């Protein structure tokens, strides 16, 4: 009797435990089916859906007249889906033949157990079409876009290029990434439990949105004129490089920017001017590529030499420490403290007025007026003119001015600064600063970007840039235009003169560091018309061989450019 009671209690405990377990399972099932159903439906959907990206077309870059400078070509991405492959050996053989890849690499990817494995990107469309037409099970051919530059080397360091993911790496391509890149779309396909895509099942598709078009101030024809002139002097003078920049001094729009030698934007990882028989490490190759991609107009600094006398003269006229009628004596040198600083004319210029001093590019004259101005005021004008700030050009990697601290500027430093030595600036900084001194006295922002457009050319928005007034007075600016016109017509800039045109400018010949290397930089800054400048250009020739004077070799380059550009811009002869 006692055993029966015990067994009955035991059975009841088991029964209640079973009821509790079943209730808990039932409750959990109800919760999953009703309250958490959406979550598990999503998991199930994700398990049987495969997402593939549809690449968005990158926006084009067009010049001021709508000439396409950067666009896209259709290419293909070849992938394999392991679970769908029926004949691996055939797939491997075909892909090796069509793609020109090593069998070991192809086999490794084909045999890898994964939902989808990329074999190769940026495959030419013709090749992709051939592979697609073979209808190989497990092989996917998706269309993609590759950046294409119709003019190869044209403005290479300005336009820049994109990487394998079609994102900008240098130049305008990276600066305007947010404008140019589009929004990728997606394709969702349904698969069975083995990961095989189901046929005749509707795909969920989100269409890509193409990037916007960037219109820039560069003019295709003006750029070509500048490229031809720069290449010619580069070859004739066997120079290390030549830079040419043309801009509108009234609004900062850049018409042309050339840096020779240019590289091919469609093959940006191929080095130029390199002996193929010379072996390099990967690090050396990368360093050489980095140097090839540099834009000397904005990335590299140099001692401006006598073109800086434009800035010294402007500061001294504005401050009132010199007048046009002041007279000076040049014996061919000036003694400053314990230094004998020479003029380029060894025998000296003798007695001369300030006007003659700037025409003759006389160092002693500029030493004298620089010392009159003094270090603190000179430094203040450096700031006022914007020389100690970046120009904020819309290209990445702009270098800043390399200048002494004001407390470190002694009399010798002040003397050499006055004629453009012992500090360094970029060509774009020189062009921008001189623009502000001849345009009436306001500083512009040099730039390429003009407008963002729809694909059909409809304007979305104009790009705006800052201007800073009060750089110098209109009177000082007018005086500088007159002085610099006289330099071209009567002084050291005569080789920049074009009959019938009014041109102002200044030449320079500066020595690079270390001085013992005997390497020079020849340059010329010129603008036209002198009375109302509409175009300003700077030419910088690095390490020319033979004759290296700026007035002899740099001024003629800008003259040859202006021979074509001034009529092209509608600037008529007087």
For each of these PLM feature ranges, what is it?
Residues 1-277, 301, 376-388, 496-497, ...:
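Periplasmic/cell-envelope proteins involved in peptidoglycan metabolism and beta-lactam response
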Residues 68-70, 192-203, 244, 249-307, ...:
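Beta-lactam-recognizing serine transpeptidase/beta-lactamase-like catalytic domain environment
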């Amino acid at each position: 009797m006692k055993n029966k009671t015990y067994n009955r209690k035991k059975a009841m405990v088991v029964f209640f435990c079973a009821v509790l377990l079943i209730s808990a399972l039932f409750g959990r099932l109800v919760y999953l089916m009703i309250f958490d159903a959406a979550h598990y439906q999503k998991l199930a959907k994700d398990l049987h859906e495969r997402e593939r990206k549809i690449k968005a077309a990158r926006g084009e870059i067009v010049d001021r007249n709508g000439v396409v400078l950067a666009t896209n070509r259709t290419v293909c991405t070849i992938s394999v889906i392991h679970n769908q492959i029926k004949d691996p050996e055939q797939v491997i053989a075909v892909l090796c033949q069509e793609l020109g890849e090593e069998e070991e690499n192809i086999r490794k990817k084909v045999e890898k157990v994964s939902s989808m494995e990329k074999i190769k990107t940026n495959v030419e469309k013709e090749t992709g079409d051939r592979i697609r037409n073979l209808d190989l099970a497990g092989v996917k051919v998706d269309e993609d876009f590759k950046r294409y530059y119709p003019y190869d080397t044209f403005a290479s360091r300005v336009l820049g290029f994109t990487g394998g993911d079609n994102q900008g790496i240098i130049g305008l391509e990276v600066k305007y990434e947010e404008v140019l890149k589009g929004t990728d779309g997606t394709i969702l396909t349904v698969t069975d439990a083995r990961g095989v895509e189901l046929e005749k099942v509707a795909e969920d598709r989100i269409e890509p949105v193409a990037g916007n078009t960037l219109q820039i101030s560069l003019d295709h024809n003006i750029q070509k004129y500048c490229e031809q002139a720069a290449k010619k002097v580069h070859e004739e003078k066997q120079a290390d490089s030549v830079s040419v920049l043309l801009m509108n001094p009234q609004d900062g729009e850049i018409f042309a920017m050339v840096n020779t030698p240019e590289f091919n934007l469609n093959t940006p990882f191929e080095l130029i001017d390199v002996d193929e028989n010379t072996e390099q490490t990967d690090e050396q190759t990368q360093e050489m590529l980095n140097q090839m991609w540099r834009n000397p107009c904005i990335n590299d600094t140099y001692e401006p030499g006598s073109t800086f006398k434009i800035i010294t003269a402007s500061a001294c006229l504005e401050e009132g420490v010199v007048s046009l009628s002041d007279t000076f004596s040049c014996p061919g040198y000036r003694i400053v403290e314990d230094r004998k600083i020479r003029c380029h004319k060894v025998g000296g210029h003798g007695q001369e007025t300030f006007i003659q001093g700037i025409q003759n590019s006389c160092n002693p004259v500029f030493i004298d007026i620089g010392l009159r101005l003094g270090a603190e005021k000179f430094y203040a004008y450096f700031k006022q003119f914007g020389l100690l700030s970046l120009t904020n050009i819309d290209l990445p990697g702009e270098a800043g001015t390399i200048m002494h601290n004001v407390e470190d500027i002694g009399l010798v430093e002040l003397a050499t600064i006055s004629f453009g030595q012992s500090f360094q600036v970029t060509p774009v900084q020189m062009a921008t600063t001189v623009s502000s001194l001849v345009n009436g006295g306001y500083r512009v922002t040099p730039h390429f970007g003009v407008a963002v457009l729809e694909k059909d050319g409809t304007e979305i928005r104009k790009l705006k840039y800052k201007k800073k007034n009060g750089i110098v007075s209109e009177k000082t600016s007018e005086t500088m235009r007159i002085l610099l016109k006289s330099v071209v017509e009567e002084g050291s800039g005569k080789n920049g003169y074009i009959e019938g045109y009014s041109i102002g400018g200044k030449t320079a010949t500066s020595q690079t560091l270390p001085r013992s290397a005997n390497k020079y930089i020849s340059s010329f800054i010129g603008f036209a018309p002198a009375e109302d400048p509409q175009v300003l250009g700077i030419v910088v020739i690095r390490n020319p061989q033979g004759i290296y004077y700026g007035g002899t070799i740099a001024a003629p380059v800008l003259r040859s450019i202006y021979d074509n550009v001034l009529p092209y811009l509608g600037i008529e002869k007087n």
